[in-house]
From Swiss-Prot:
This is Valine--tRNA ligase. The keyword Protein biosynthesis applies. One of its GO terms (biological process) is valyl-tRNA aminoacylation. ValRS has two distinct active sites: one for aminoacylation and one for editing. The misactivated threonine is translocated from the active site to the editing site. The C-terminal coiled-coil domain is crucial for aminoacylation activity. A motif ('KMSKS' region) lies at residues 557-561. The lineage of its organism: Bacteria, Bacillati, Cyanobacteriota, Cyanophyceae, Synechococcales. ATP binds at K560. It comes from Prochlorococcus marinus (strain MIT 9313).
């Protein structure tokens, strides 16, 4: 091999293999197209390799992706790309969710702006409009997912209303009904007046509000009791519901009211007689110990009513207005009725007092209005039998939660589970596969109307004819299923279930890992485990990796309402996808931990993501440097270095590489992705770019020997540099896929139809591991760093050479420094390097210390001492001024109490740093005498 000169065409070609500067947009677009067109991520279920599968949490087709989606994507794609490099047959399956309530809410707002309702439009036309909106919005979301560099199989993309998934939903409903696990009944449900639909407990958000507690007087029927009691006093936060009261309850052990149990009261405003009952649910020590009972409008009262066989009087319509049972308040909106009821009670002398009261109010997560507990006939799933199977699996460690603390949260929810209301009074969604058998002349539905559950209308017709004869009319239930019903089938419905012969299902189910946020453990994770247990007999995933939230620089949760959300595409446009992905993953301190992402809204910039972009630039420049110094060779053509020819720096970087490989694999395998990113960053930036590249420069340009052959040491340096960079790019690929693919192709000269994404993880050569060498080399690095710092203090020009003295009493450290004299000379611009056991104090020197090493930099005749002394005094004065300000701030009691903890910590850190700077300046001044 011969060295290339700058004029050599091969040299020019090598230098031009990568552009001078990194263009993220062009690079990312090019590789995204290449991957997709080549089917790189479209696996064959018959292919070799251990199956590994992930189904992505399907984003709702309701707009644009947010930073939480970007974070989830970065984590999932890091995992699946790593597993693909491990030789596994990886399926990452994408898709979107129809988001029933969310989409219908958006569409009804659009219709309202057009002064029409969905009923004016009709169901068929409304659904046509919904599908058109889905195509537009869903297509936008898919494009955004592509921009994030997701290595998913787009050919297997699914949508929860696809025909295949719809068939799976109908099959699941029928089977659960056949098993007696789905039933229809009248129960108290959470009703959202805004969307006109029932919502599940999990779709209700509790909000703390400042309200009132109204104390009301309920007179005894027929006048005072024997002890003179004339009335009972109750308190409520919802006085409009008292119109539906059917009793007042007291605790049976409460001596104050025991004699009144069985007597009756007059319901204020309506004049109905209601009984005084005894129930253990009542807390006699809370308030007056008397509780109004409204079974049709309160879950606890509903239970009391069931126990005492009380009537259920609904006083509210489904639109939130009062109905005929509300008497003179009929037609009023519920909140207007509240005011009117309070005014009427006050007028009749039945309002005792009003107290301010802060309490939790249930809000519809989608409708954004307070929900009303209302009696309604709905479809329910019996959850206890489904949860029992999950409990059994969890006892055997399935699924495994990472971090483990979320297992308890999951188990507790399974234990405290209630039946799930799955019907929604909407049009967009999976229509419930149930048909009512009605009269040809009367299609009004009642609770007594018989119904049939079937997989299709034809099957329902057949059932109807078999049961009722030929002359029947069937009418499908108008309601749709809760979105989470179909989402609960996602891991296996997307792979072909209920077709048990599906190749995808056989190969990749159960899936390997679910990556999701803690906020949907109940909404989604538990529903999937219960559905999977019921229909496949196995848990749907081996591991559940729970990640935290993305918070802003003030540690606030990002949300639309807070106005602190960040559009990931803005940061991608500015810094590139890989920079954003790397920044998000690197910020993860531990599994399940929230991350912070700074963002300047005025300039649409982020220092965190910019740092990741700078890292990408660093890698780009390092690879270009290698290409210009490998003599037109590739890692493959250069081959492995001969261990006998390795220099100190070579052995050090190869030991670091072997350790990094081992550590990164262990961290990827254990979902410590943030740690893996930090390890690779430190290795690439510090070990390779800051040190090995600098140390290798003199060896990469040694000139030629008499025979014209490249010196053996130059060849070794090339081999090591090529190997280290090639392995690094593979290890970085899961985190920065586009950049690593581009650089890997440039470095290896691989054909365009060969992809880093499908390569094998580099083998770790454990024979290179050398703990003692790494420790020694760290001492060498620190010695060089001290010399550089002393040069900076002295104000020496970059080209100015000075002698350097190292003083140490440790023979092994002295030997290391002697061995590395050439490297020290090159990296510190040393005129000479002397290693001794005692100092030569005949000259004035600047001194530095690193462990057991003293470093002396003679400055007599080389530095303007007066100017240096002036700079040091100025530095000292600046540091002392900063110390005074920070110390005073910390001494202020108000600051310590009122300032956020992170601000106090930052102030303390700055004070410690200023004190260290002041002490260093004093030491330097002392050295000058």
């Amino acid at each position: 091999m011969t060295e290339l000169s700058a004029a050599d065409p091969a040299f020019v070609q090598a230098a031009d293999a990568l552009a001078k500067t990194y263009d993220p947009a062009g690079t990312e677009s090019r590789w995204q197209c290449a991957w997709e067109e080549s089917g790189v991520f479209h696996p064959d279920p018959q292919a070799a390799g251990e199956p590994f599968s992930v189904v992505i949490p399907p984003p709702n087709v309701t707009g644009s992706l947010h930073m939480g989606h970007a974070f989830n994507t970065a984590l999932i794609d890091t995992i699946v790309r790593f597993q693909r490099l491990q030789g596994k047959n990886v399926l990452c399956l994408p898709g979107t969710d129809h988001a029933s309530i969310a989409v219908q809410t958006i569409l009804e707002k659009q219709l309202k702006a057009e002064a029409i309702s969905r009923y004016d439009l009709g169901r068929e036309a409304f659904l046509e409009r919904a599908w058109a909106w889905k195509e537009e919005s869903g297509g936008r979301i898919v494009d955004q997912l592509r921009r994030l560099g997701y290595s998913v199989d787009w050919q297997r993309q699914r949508f929860t209303l696809d025909e295949g998934l719809s068939a799976a939903v109908r099959e699941a409903f029928v089977r659960l009904h056949e098993q007696g696990l789905i039933y229809r009944g009248e129960y108290l449900v959470n009703w959202c007046p805004a969307s006109g639909s029932a919502v599940s407990d999990l779709e209700v958000e509790m909000k703390e509000v400042d309200g009132h507690l109204w104390h009301l007087r309920y007179p005894l029927t027929g006048g005072p009791a024997a002890d003179g009691t004339t009335h009972l006093e109750v308190a409520t936060t919802r006085p409009e519901t008292m119109l539906g009261d059917v009793a007042v309850a007291v605790n049976p052990a409460d001596e104050r009211y025991r004699h009144l149990v069985g007597q009756t009261l007059i319901l204020p405003l309506l004049g109905r007689e209601i009984p005084v009952i005894a129930d253990d649910h009542v807390d006699q020590d809370f308030g007056t110990g008397c509780v109004k009972v409204t079974p049709a409008h309160d879950p606890n009262d509903f239970a009391i009513g069931r126990r005492h066989d009380l009537p259920q009087i609904t006083v509210m319509n489904k639109n939130g207005s009062m109905n005929g049972h509300a008497g003179r308040f009929e037609g009023l909106d519920r909140f207007e009725a509240r005011k009117a009821v309070v005014a009427a009670l006050q007028e009749e002398g039945l309002l005792v007092k009003v107290e301010p009261h802060r309490h939790s109010v249930p809000y519809s997560d989608r409708g954004k209005v307070p929900v009303e507990p209302l009696l309604s006939t709905q479809w329910f799933v019996r959850m206890e039998p489904l949860a029992a199977r999950c409990h059994e699996c969890l006892d055997h460690g399935a699924p495994r939660f990472v971090p483990n603390r979320w297992q308890k949260v999951y188990r507790d929810w399974l234990t405290e589970i209630r039946d799930w209301c799955i019907s929604r009074q909407l049009w967009w969604g999976h229509r419930i596969p149930a048909w009512f058998v009605v009269s040809e002349t009367d299609d009004q539905l009642t609770d007594a109307t018989p119904y049939l559950v079937a997989r299709s209308e034809e099957e329902a017709w057949q059932q109807a004819r078999d049961q009722f004869g030929e002359a029947v009319v069937i009418q499908q239930d108008e309601d749709v299923l809760d979105t989470w019903f179909s989402s609960g089938l996602w891991p296996f419905s997307t792979m072909g279930w209920p077709d048990q012969e599906s190749a995808d299902l056989e190969c990749w189910y159960p899936t390997s890992t679910l990556v999701t946020g803690f906020d949907i453990i109940f909404f989604w994770v538990a529903r999937m485990t219960m559905m999977a247990g019921a229909f496949t007999g196995r848990m749907p995933f081996a591991d559940v990796y729970i990640h935290g939230l993305v918070r802003d620089e003030q540690n606030r949760k990002m949300s639309k309402s807070a106005g602190n959300g960040i559009d990931p595409l803005l940061l991608i446009e500015r810094y590139g996808t890989d920079a954003l992905r790397f920044a998000l993953v690197r910020e993860v301190a531990g599994a399940g931990q929230d991350i912070r992402l700074d963002y300047d809204r005025k300039s649409d910039t982020s220092a965190t993501v910019e740092a990741a972009r700078n890292f990408a630039n660093k890698l780009w420049n390092a690879t270009r440097f290698a290409l210009m110094n490998l003599g037109g060779e590739t890692p493959a053509s250069l081959g492995e270095p001969d261990p006998a020819s390795l220099q100190l720096a070579d052995r050090w970087i190869l030991s670091r590489l072997a350790r990094m490989n081992r550590d990164v694999v262990e961290r990827y395998d254990s979902y410590r992705l943030g740690e893996a990113a930090k390890c690779l960053y430190e290795f690439a930036w510090n070990d390779i770019c800051d040190w090995y590249l600098e140390l290798s420069k003199r060896r990469l340009h040694p000139g030629e020997d008499a025979s014209g052959e490249v010196l053996a040491d130059q060849c070794t340096a090339r081999q090591v540099l090529a190997k280290v960079l090639a392995d690094l790019l593979v290890m970085l690929h899961p985190l920065m896929p586009h950049l690593s693919e581009e650089l890997w192709h440039g470095l290896t000269g691989a054909p365009k139809d060969t992809f880093l994404a499908l390569q094998s993880w580099p083998a770790s050569n454990k024979s290179f591991l050398d703990d003692a060498l790494e420790l020694s080399f760290t001492e060498l690095i620190e010695a060089i760093r001290v010399v550089r710092n002393l040069r900076a203090v002295a104000g020496l020009k970059p080209a100015q050479t000075v002698p350097v003295q190292f003083i140490t009493g440790r023979p092994e450290l002295a030997a290391l420094l002697e061995q590395a004299t050439a490297d020290i000379t090159a990296l510190t611009r040393a005129e000479s390097v002397v290693v001794a056991t005692s100092a030569d104090l005949t000259q004035r020197c600047l001194a530095g210390v690193s462990g057991e090493l003293q470093v002396l930099l003679p400055i007599d005749g080389l530095v303007d001492l007066d100017a240096l002394r002036g700079r040091l005094e100025k530095d000292l004065a600046k540091a002392e001024k900063e110390i005074a300000g920070l110390a005073g701030r910390l001494a202020n009691p108000n600051f310590a109490i009122k300032a956020p903890p992170n601000v106090v910590e930052e102030c303390q850190s700055n004070l410690a740093e200023a004190e260290a700077q002041a002490e260093l300046a004093r030491q330097r001044l002392s050295d000058l005498g």
